[in-house]
Amino acid sequence: MVICDTPADKQPRRERRKDARPGELMDAALSLFVEKGFAGTRVEDVAMRAGVSKGTLFLYFPSKVELFKAVVRENITGRFNEWNTTLDAFQGTTSELVHYCMQQWWERIGATQASGITKLVMSEGALFPEIAAFYRQEVIEPGNALIRRVLSRGVDRGEFRPVNLDYAIYSLISPMIFIIMWKHSMAPCCPMGDEGQLNIDPQTFIANQADILLNGLSVCPGRNNA
């Protein structure tokens, strides 16, 4: 009996390994950026963790800054198209959309290692203006635009009061920044279950913050909604 190779089988193992290297390097870099920060991460340590040489890393990423940019694009920036498509297709109320978006953000970003990128930029952005400017362009600006679309939807449909949307954006962002900073600072020191615990369940926190925010935004009979 003749066994025919599949297309995948015909690809040399070394070539398959080569194709996987950028992803392996970005995974290693993400872990180290979150653990040690941008300044504390050395490219040779990234290469070692990925199981390749420093020279191999530079074949794919010419500098640590370019490696950082690739990590951000891979783990955060690439999701904005998906989220905008979801917004376009959403059939529920805008209050339901806000709850959905905040919980989805936690599941896709907040609960993953990628959330540590935000803490890194907030901590080290002033020292590395190039990565701060990149993060603003690739994450903050499209993120703000997406949130503004959500809030505008509510105003246009008569569900939300006509507030200053440019500032209302930060009412949604602030709880997310808080829970990220908590996760990567105090949370490891405050295990869940301790009596008098200070730890916070992220999903409960996000749902509660969304509820408080929406009660402030929603049009209510008998209240000055202007």
Language model regions located:
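C-terminal peripheral helix-coil segments that are non-catalytic and often amphipathic
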Residues: 1-12, 96, 100, 104, ...
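Helix-loop "lid/cap" segments that line or gate small-molecule binding pockets
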Residues: 103-110, 118-126, 213-217
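Basic, helix-initiating cap at the start of DNA-binding domains
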Residues: 1-36, 40-52, 59-66, 92
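Amphipathic, non-transmembrane alpha-helical scaffold segments
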Residues: 18, 26, 72, 132, ...
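Amphipathic alpha-helical packing segments from all-alpha helical-bundle domains
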Residues: 96, 107, 111, 116, ...
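Amphipathic alpha-helical linker/stalk segments
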Residues: 69-101, 107-109, 113, 117, ...
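Hydrophobic/aromatic residues within well-ordered alpha-helical segments
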Residues: 21, 64, 75-79, 94, ...
